């Protein structure tokens, strides 16, 4: 497998943190060119702070972290402290970061990196609202054909919504941004709730993280201890779904995932279904496919990979 050059666009978030750790623990497959923070689970000052905390937890204070957009394109920001806590990384007690944010805006970093790197070599990995990505596409459309692909966490169809009856949080926060990305023509792989709700941290899986006996393993276990309470109370699930790590795991082990290439459109007008990812699973619309919609994962294989990689940190 060729080395994947990626930019992680993120709003940490406990599951974002695990995704970052997985990427930084996998240098044979993944080269992280930089991390851009976006407002989402918590406001931008906290997501930018949390991204640096996680880099230091992984032993990578050299990683370039940039602050991006602090609000959606045209709507007030909606956050998810009720899920992730006031800091966004509630659970473990982690030291404040000592590494500095890079001075450049995250969107400028995305644009400049895609213009500089060889065409077709960079994958964008958005783990939060798509505001930074859409802004980059809008301001510099020349970068779109230079992408390898966009592998994102967002959306839902058969699994329905987690912030409204029909919408997944990342898409709902900035549906106009999602519409720009899905209509851009960029190759898209999406990890919707349909697959991420199958990547559940059961007690034995969380015990395996804790049993690693490392700071990263302990932190992930404590993040999950906090994060899982919402899903257990709301959905009666067996544990916390690791949404965002599915993006990184797909880059390392695509064979763990299955999906279907279909048309996905974003609802931006209806107050009833705002932010819905309208997925033409049965190809009845006649619209051209624009996304690989991932629907299933080998959960045991996923957690084996994740545990093995966290053991490196």
Each model region followed by its residue ranges:
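A short alpha-helix-loop-beta-strand transition element characteristic
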Residues: 59-66
